[in-house]
Amino acid sequence: HEQKKSVPMKTSRRSLLIGATALGLSGCIPASPLVTSQAASSPLDPDLLPTPNASYDAWVAAFRTRAQARGISAATLSRAFRGTGFLPGVVERDRNQAEFTRTLEDYLALVASEPKVTAGRAAFARQGAVLRQIEARYGVPAELVCAIWGVESNFGTRRGDIPVISATSTLAFDGRRGEFFEAQLIAALRILENGDTTPERLVGSWAGAMGHTQFIPTTFEA
């Protein structure tokens, strides 16, 4: 097939707004990181630290049986849940997402501000070659990948430091979107089962989104 020629890069507010509506894309980023380091993590808020909760503990005990029935080994479950726990702040954030509490106009002004556009141009200048490789491999325009990267993790500088197992198990236990988050928890456990990373390094947002593009575990697996 004839390969389509690349168009000159034009990072603009429009590119970032398009990126804000295209967050369902998967498979856009290669295994190698687009930036080499993450900004230093600040201490977690107290409500994002494990809090004793007997009902959560009982839920986890029952979940382990379901997880083993779906192929997760007892060894992986033991490693994954060591040091984890109920995170009340995760439930609070799930109830008060910015996308739901701000108007669309205010939200888009935040995620596609002039400083974000400027940062996007700089990020594209640094990583343009990698972004073009992604475009050639997956057919997703490099500018759109860069926009998603900026909206989701501020170009790799805000990838989150909340343990994914604690976050997804808390939300699965909470029940508002229990089935969805139990699926994310199972997928996260499969990531560990496959040896893709360690429990200590499996961190992300309060909702379990991970990495530069903040993919949830099931999207990572797709």
Region spans (language model):
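Catalytic glycan-binding domains that act on GlcNAc-containing polysaccharides
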Residues: 74-222
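N-terminal export signals
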Residues: 10-11, 15-37
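Near-N-terminal "mature-domain entry" segment
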Residues: 52-86, 90
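Short, Lys/Arg-enriched N-terminal segments with co-localized hydrophobic residues
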Residues: 1-8
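C-terminal segment of N-terminal export signals and the immediately downstream linker at the start
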Residues: 29-66
